[in-house]
């Protein structure tokens, strides 16, 4: 990604959506696509799609559209999916167990390799292909395995404490499923997943924009 262009955060958050859709076209043997087809499938305005893509140079040609293979190569490079991304999860309650069981089965290049909890009845369990470790091993293991990305599913009351430990371990990205906001240094990216807000947003759009 060019260091000369400031890419809007909203654009970056749409890249995985584009990638998943283009991957589905590839699996169907389709070799090119235009912005209207992407718009119809993802319900994103065509102008927004063209603007998003324009930040990354000439990805397509007017009158032709976008080559599927070229788009896939681009998205893989931007989303770091050309290399295996190892992920850890902290907090193996109901949500944590569900995520471990799912373990990004549709993504060949992302996998949860480590899981941590404080509960004695959970530590040592094998969930999916991952054995749950004691939180006491958190910092040491993350450093040793060079894990940069962590999914946080702990109780809210300990979320900040765990986040501080993640920063100490060198983690650069946290997907926070806890209700509370966590504070981290500016070089650590935090994405807050609030299911209540997402559902409220969904209901709003259903009420106001459904045909």
Swiss-Prot record:
The role this protein plays is: Modulates transcription in response to changes in cellular NADH/NAD(+) redox state.
Pfam families linked to this entry: CoA_binding, Put_DNA-bind_N
Question: What SMART domains does the annotation carry?
Answer: CoA_binding
Which residue pairs form cystines in this protein? Answer: none
Q: Which GO terms describe its molecular function?
A: DNA binding; DNA-binding transcription factor activity
GO biological processes: negative regulation of DNA-templated transcription; response to redox state
NCBIfam families for the chain? PRK05472.1-3 (NF003989), PRK05472.1-5 (NF003991), PRK05472.2-3 (NF003994), PRK05472.2-4 (NF003995), PRK05472.2-5 (NF003996)
- The parts of the chain that form a coiled coil are none
Q: How does it assemble?
A: Homodimer.
Query: According to its UniProt record, where is this protein located?
Result: Cytoplasm
Which protein are we looking at?
Redox-sensing transcriptional repressor Rex
What organism is this sequence from?
Staphylococcus aureus (strain bovine RF122 / ET3-1)
The family assignment reads: Belongs to the transcriptional regulatory Rex family.
User: What GO cellular component term, any one, is given?
Assistant: cytoplasm
Start-end of DNA-binding region: 17-56
What gene is this protein a product of?
A: rex
PANTHER family xref list: REDOX-SENSING TRANSCRIPTIONAL REPRESSOR REX (PTHR35786), REDOX-SENSING TRANSCRIPTIONAL REPRESSOR REX 1 (PTHR35786:SF1)
């Amino acid at each position: 990604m060019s260091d000369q262009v400031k890419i809007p955060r909203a654009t970056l958050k749409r890249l995985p959506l584009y990638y998943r859709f283009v991957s589905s076209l590839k699996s169907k043997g389709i070799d090119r696509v235009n912005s209207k087809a992407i718009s119809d499938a993802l319900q994103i305005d065509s102008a927004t799609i063209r603007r998003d893509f324009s930040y990354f140079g000439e990805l397509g040609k007017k009158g032709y559209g976008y080559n599927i293979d070229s788009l896939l190569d681009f998205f893989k490079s931007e989303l770091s999916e050309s290399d295996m991304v190892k992920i850890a999860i902290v907090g193996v309650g109901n949500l944590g167990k569900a995520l471990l069981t799912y373990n990004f089965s549709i993504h060949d290049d992302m996998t949860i390799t480590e899981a941590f909890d404080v509960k004695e009845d959970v530590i040592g369990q094998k969930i999916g292909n991952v054995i749950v470790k004691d939180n006491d091993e958190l910092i040491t293991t993350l450093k040793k395995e060079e894990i940069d990305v962590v999914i946080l599913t702990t109780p809210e009351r300990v979320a900040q404490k765990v986040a501080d430990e993640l920063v100490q371990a060198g983690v650069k990205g946290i997907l926070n499923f806890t209700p509370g906001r966590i504070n981290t240094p500016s070089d650590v990216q935090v994405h807050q997943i609030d299911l209540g807000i997402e559902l409220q947003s969904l209901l709003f759009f259903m009420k106001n924009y459904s045909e």
